[in-house]
Amino acid sequence: MSELPRVGLGFDVHVFEPGRPCWLVGLLFPDNDGCAGHSDGDVAVHALCDAVLSAAGQGDIGGLFAVGDPRWERVSGADMLRHVVELLLRHGYEVVNASVQVIGNRPKIGPRRTEAQRLLSALLRAPVSVAATTTEGLGLTGRGEGLSAIATALVVQV
């Protein structure tokens, strides 16, 4: 009998850093400030990476892309996701599907949702759904100080 599918959960949060490029769901949003971070600050992709790693029992992005390691400084979320997928394949897993929800007031994801889903699906080699919500003025994201994202991923052993 083959191993049952495995589910992983990922979460990330970053504050905005004025003047920094805004990368979110793998896309550049040029009219918005980006998020602070060692890499590109893309909370959605980081949450996806954590969800995929968690599902396959491979730790988290903090362990894989250590902040003190200069190889990962300013690395793109797309490159991180590619690296995670390759790691998964080496360990005998593949992603079945994933979902990510961005939490924040800006930038608006809706107008670029299809573009984001296509990009993330290509990177993960599996269907990815993208959603967004706000916290109705509550907390860091509600005050417009940053963004967070939560993601799930389903993987199977191949």
UniProtKB/Swiss-Prot annotation:
It catalyses: 4-CDP-2-C-methyl-D-erythritol 2-phosphate = 2-C-methyl-D-erythritol 2,4-cyclic diphosphate + CMP. Pathway: Isoprenoid biosynthesis; isopentenyl diphosphate biosynthesis via DXP pathway; isopentenyl diphosphate from 1-deoxy-D-xylulose 5-phosphate: step 4/6. Keywords: Isoprene biosynthesis, Lyase, Metal-binding. One of its GO terms (biological process) is isopentenyl diphosphate biosynthetic process, methylerythritol 4-phosphate pathway. Binds 1 divalent metal cation per subunit. Pfam families: YgbB (PF02542). The keyword Lyase applies. The record marks 38, 134 as: Transition state stabilizer. 4-CDP-2-C-methyl-D-erythritol 2-phosphate binds at residues 12-14, 38-39, 60-62, 133-136, 143. PANTHER family: 2-C-METHYL-D-ERYTHRITOL 2,4-CYCLODIPHOSPHATE SYNTHASE, CHLOROPLASTIC. Involved in the biosynthesis of isopentenyl diphosphate (IPP) and dimethylallyl diphosphate (DMAPP), two major building blocks of isoprenoid compounds. Catalyzes the conversion of 4-diphosphocytidyl-2-C-methyl-D-erythritol 2-phosphate (CDP-ME2P) to 2-C-methyl-D-erythritol 2,4-cyclodiphosphate (ME-CPP) with a corresponding release of cytidine 5-monophosphate (CMP). This is 2-C-methyl-D-erythritol 2,4-cyclodiphosphate synthase. The gene is ispF.
